[in-house]
Design a protein with these regions (language model features):
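Short, His- and charge-rich active-site/binding loops that engage polyanionic ligands
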Residues: 84-110, 159-206
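C-terminal active-site "lid" helix and adjoining low-complexity regulatory extension at the edge
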Residues: 214-223, 251-317
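A short, polar/proline- and glycine-enriched secondary-structure boundary/capping micro-motif
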Residues: 174-183, 269-273, 361-364, 411-415
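Short beta-strand micro-motifs enriched in acidic
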Residues: 157-159, 250-254, 406
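A long amphipathic alpha-helix within ATP-dependent nucleotide-binding catalytic cores
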Residues: 118-148, 176-252
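Active-site nucleotide/adenylate-binding loops and adjacent lid/helix of ATP-dependent enzymes
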Residues: 4-21, 25-153, 160, 346
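Pepsin/retropepsin-fold aspartyl endopeptidases
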Residues: 284-429
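Short, surface-exposed charged micro-motifs
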Residues: 155, 248-250, 340
Length: 429
């Protein structure tokens, strides 16, 4: 497992960040039905509800034989995947279905389970609950070879309207088609900038291949990635009393990303799946002024871009560069513009000359991540520098990062590359 002072532990999570979740927000997240009601009211996609059972009489009177071939029976206030029954398909006789593990379930079994839900057996706070039946999502073809049975989902951690980490959760035979890590599902880290899978963790162990297959964990690109991230932030926007939350999103074959549920107390295994501690990420975005969901996604992808430095070094060898190098900058019109840059490990963040940034179209409002957060000391005191999204190529390697904008007209080079963007390089003196 990763070891670092920046790893977020349960105590730090509870003390430092769960305080951003107010009572009303926790009440919404703890009720799947209330969450769905708010999502639908704000026109955010979520799987349809087929039936709601508030009393034993509702369960007895419900026409179970009219249910579709597959569906999901859930507790409204359940947690950790407990109490969820995933029905795969109808069996030969009426009133019988197969579960994900091939076992048979009858109408009588489902009624009894629904009564168990109402009694509070699976409730987060051990109180009475509501049972409901939800449509079962048809998964996209891209996932078919990565799951045993069941539908994978994507957990996005959102703090201050910025996605700070993401994880694909793959159901396994052990998890019986469910995507909960504590029941045996696989957690797979996702690069925030790309939506590409990176590292896998199963029952606390790192893995490189899907169990019972030779299929690699890394390298799978999640479709509609920016839309998924934006949807996660919008979920926080409609429940603003949840400042730090997990958003579970599923990809429907025909309708695209849909929100399954919100989690006011997200687990921390996502750090292991990404090989990246959370504490520093959360501190970097705390207090930023985020205009909207798209702005939050842009900041996340600039700050937390997956560099794959270790993999690149393993495959290509360490690249040696000079103190001054030619780079290509991705301009606002998507053209690549070549210029010279100074390589400076004494500076943390890269910077670009204001006039050059203006000519390249990088100072447009949608590319400015923040204006007043980053300051430098000048003859007239502390001066704010805007920070922009910045993509460039150095020694054939693409780097997606952030850069401060300053007046470099009296400098020899219009761009400075700081040590934050020099992982995997050796600098020739």
């Amino acid at each position: 497992m990763i070891t670092s002072v920046n790893v977020l532990g349960l105590n730090a999570r509870n003390h430092l960040f769960l305080s951003f979740n107010k009572k009303e927000g926790r009440r919404v997240a703890d009720s799947k039905l209330l969450t769905k009601r708010i999502l639908r009211r704000n026109h955010l996609p979520t799987p349809a509800i087929l039936a709601i059972f508030r009393s034993p009489q509702d369960i007895v009177n419900f026409p179970w034989e009219r249910l579709p071939d597959n569906f999901v029976l859930k507790p409204s206030k359940g947690f950790g995947g407990q109490g969820v029954v995933i029905v795969k398909k109808k069996a030969k006789w009426a009133g019988e279905w197969y579960l994900m593990d091939g076992s048979l379930v009858t109408t009588q079994d489902l009624r009894f389970h629904a009564l168990e839900i109402l009694s509070g057996r699976f409730s987060l706070h051990n109180g009475v609950d509501i049972a409901f039946i939800e449509e079962r999502i048809k998964i996209q073809k891209i996932f078919a070879k990565y799951v045993w049975h069941g539908a994978p989902d994507i957990r996005i951690l959102v703090f201050n309207k910025v996605p700070v980490a993401a994880m694909l959760r793959l159901p396994t035979r052990e998890s019986k088609g469910k995507s909960n890590l504590h029941q045996g599902a696989i957690g797979v880290g996702l690069g925030l900038a790309t939506g590409i899978t990176t590292h896998g963790v199963l029952n606390g162990r790192f893995i490189k291949f899907i169990p019972e297959t030779k299929r690699k964990i890394n390298g799978l690109k999640i479709p509609q990635w920016d839309k998924i991230l934006t949807l996660a932030v919008r979920a926080q926007e409609v429940v603003p009393s949840l400042g730090f939350l997990g958003v579970d999103i599923i990809l429907d074959k025909n309708r695209g990303p849909m929100i399954l549920e919100l989690n006011a107390r997200p687990g921390l295994e996502i750090q292991n799946a990404n090989w990246s501690p959370l504490k520093k990420r959360l501190e970097r975005v705390e207090g930023l002024e985020i205009k909207d969901a798209e702005h939050g996604v842009k900041i996340a992808q600039a700050l937390f871009a997956e560099r794959f430095a270790d993999r690149v070094m393993a495959e290509e060898g360490i690249k040696t560069i000079n103190a001054v190098e030619k780079i290509k900058i991705l301009a606002g019109d998507k053209n690549k513009i070549e210029t010279e840059a100074k390589i400076d490990t004494g500076a943390f963040r890269s910077s670009i000359d204001r006039d050059l940034a203006e000519r390249l179209g990088l100072l447009k409002e949608e590319n400015i991540l923040w204006k007043n957060r980053f300051e430098y000391r000048s003859a007239v005191g502390l001066q704010p520098r805007p920070v922009i999204g910045f993509t460039f190529w150095l020694a054939g390697r693409k780097i997606q990062t952030t850069a401060s904008v300053s007046n470099r007209s009296k400098m020899n080079y219009p761009v400075l590359i700081g040590r934050n963007d020099l992982m995997g390089f050796l600098i020739r003196p």
